């Protein structure tokens, strides 16, 4: 199986998952604790960037993450399609 095929399979598995318990189980099976923490930090970063007027440095300090991670998240939000999608999915 190619990486592309595996990626498509992963997307299908995640899309077919309809309970939070099942999703948690899948994520715990395929991600290391460190990878899970990185994903959680990204969600926290997007939430702060989308829902506050804090500077990137303030967000980094508040969340206890590197300014590099904040800058990467802010760069992703420059794409209006991504920003609109995340705004609909992420809220307080």
From Swiss-Prot:
The keyword Transcription regulation is annotated on this UniProt entry: yes
GO molecular function, one term: DNA-binding transcription factor activity
DNA-binding region: 56-78
Gene Ontology annotations of biological process type: negative regulation of DNA-templated transcription
Gene Ontology cellular component list: cytoplasm
Keyword DNA-binding: yes
InterPro entries: Trp_repress, Trp_repress_bac, Trp_repressor/repl_initiator, TrpR-like_sf
Cell compartments where the protein resides: Cytoplasm
Classification via Pfam families: Trp_repressor
Function recorded in the entry: This protein is an aporepressor. When complexed with L-tryptophan it binds the operator region of the trp operon and prevents the initiation of transcription.
PANTHER family from the UniProt entry: TRP OPERON REPRESSOR (PTHR38025:SF1)
Family in the record: Belongs to the TrpR family.
Oligomeric and partner information: Homodimer.
Protein name: Trp operon repressor homolog
Gene from which this protein is expressed: trpR
């Amino acid at each position: 199986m190619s990486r592309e095929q595996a990626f498509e399979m992963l997307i299908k598995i995640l899309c077919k998952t309809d309970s939070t318990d099942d999703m948690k189980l899948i994520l715990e099976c395929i991600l290391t604790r460190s990878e899970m923490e990185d994903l959680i930090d990204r969600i926290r970063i997007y939430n702060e960037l989308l829902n506050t007027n804090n500077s990137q440095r303030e967000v980094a300090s508040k969340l206890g993450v590197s300014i590099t991670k904040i800058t990467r998240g802010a760069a992703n939000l420059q794409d209006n399609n991504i920003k609109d999608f995340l705004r609909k999915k992420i809220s307080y």
